[in-house]
Amino acid sequence: MEETVNNQETPETSEEETADEETVAVENTAAGKVLPSFGPGDTIKVHARIKEGDKERIQMFQGVVLKVKQAADGGNFTVRRISYGVGVERTFPFLSPNVTKVEVIKRGRVRRARLFYLRKLSGKAARIKEVKQTPS
């Protein structure tokens, strides 16, 4: 009888397995923070803690999500932006204590899970269609 109870609890606790590949909502239990759900094509702003010498500050990195990797150790996501004409990509772990906050600026409509083709595009060709929000 105890085995049945354990089998019933397992699907409820494994939210990571039932999460959609394109969107992810991760709860960092160590820091007690919840990241919003986002996926490839979304424009997000990541607030990252940067330590320079003995000083510490928050740096914002806004860009398009290229990929979201979900793994047993929490996974990571890659964000790309164009800075002074040069493409800059940063990969952030979901469970990193250096990621203080993630804001979703706009939702993008894409048909791929990995948007590496954006690396070759520039200007208007690199635009992503925005998801139309239906009024509730």
Swiss-Prot record:
GO terms for biological process: translation. Pfam families: Ribosomal_L19. Keywords: Ribonucleoprotein, Ribosomal protein. One of its GO terms (molecular function) is structural constituent of ribosome. InterPro entries: Ribosomal_bL19, Ribosomal_bL19_CS, Ribosomal_bL19_sf, Translation_prot_SH3-like_sf. It comes from the Bacteria. Coiled coil: none annotated. Residues 12-23 have a biased composition (Acidic residues). Residues 1-23 are annotated as: Disordered. GO terms for cellular component: cytosolic large ribosomal subunit. Belongs to the bacterial ribosomal protein bL19 family. This protein is located at the 30S-50S ribosomal subunit interface and may play a role in the structure and function of the aminoacyl-tRNA binding site. This is Large ribosomal subunit protein bL19. It comes from Dehalococcoides mccartyi (strain ATCC BAA-2266 / KCTC 15142 / 195) (Dehalococcoides ethenogenes (strain 195)). The lineage of its organism: Bacteria, Bacillati, Chloroflexota, Dehalococcoidia, Dehalococcoidales.
